[in-house]
């Protein structure tokens, strides 16, 4: 007997039907999707070594708030390779100075990745990096991280600076919401048209016999 059917995948949304299962089991599946599916994230917690190292930040956002914001950025990675993922292989970094006369929005598009498994280490191409941090499928925008104020003089070295490095780790949503691969996971009952027809038919026959 098949319990799952009618899978529909549309951009970042997955829908499917569940048959012949109690609601308690369906709810358990929903909770597993939220809290027990492993994914990548940047860990940063008080009292433990942080995976986010901020080397220089002259923007108006203080380091703790910035680290928290970075930790909630979703990282796309092949789920089949998660078990063998090496935390020390990839170094994610941002090194940017706003030397323009306009404010600069720093987004996930500015994150670069250094492959430390190579000798010497190499920086991944923009196309390879975009596989980790994908733009919104509708707006094509990247996630905003920070905004650097413009240079007062327009001279090099006068603008705000953001320099940091990060290391991604594998975990699950039970530890922290940053490791949850699903922002929404819900279920609802569907109308069983076959059973409805049978009910109406039985009701009709009952009324006919009653007359």
Predicted regions and their residues:
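Protein-protein interaction/assembly regions in multi-subunit complexes
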Residues: 1-211
């Amino acid at each position: 007997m098949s319990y799952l059917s009618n899978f529909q995948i549309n951009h970042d949304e997955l829908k499917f039907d569940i048959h012949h299962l109690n609601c308690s089991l369906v709810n358990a599946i929903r909770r597993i999707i939220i809290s027990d599916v492993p994914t990548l994230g940047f860990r940063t917690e008080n009292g433990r070594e942080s995976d986010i190292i901020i080397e220089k930040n002259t923007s108006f956002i203080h380091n703790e708030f910035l680290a928290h914001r970075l930790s909630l950025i979703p990282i796309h990675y092949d789920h089949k390779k998660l078990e063998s993922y090496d935390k020390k292989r990839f170094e994610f970094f941002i090194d940017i100075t706003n030397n323009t006369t306009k404010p600069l929005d720093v987004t996930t598009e500015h994150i670069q990745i250094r492959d430390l498994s190579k000798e010497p280490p190499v920086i991944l191409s923009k196309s390879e990096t975009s596989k980790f941090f994908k733009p919104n499928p509708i707006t094509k925008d990247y996630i905003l991280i920070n905004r650097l104020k413009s240079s007062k003089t327009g001279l090099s070295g006068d603008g705000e600076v953001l320099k940091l490095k990060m290391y991604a780790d594998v975990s699950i949503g039970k530890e922290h919401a940053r490791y949850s691969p699903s922002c929404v996971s819900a279920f609802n009952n569907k109308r069983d048209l076959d059973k409805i027809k049978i009910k109406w038919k039985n009701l009709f026959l009952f009324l006919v016999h009653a007359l």
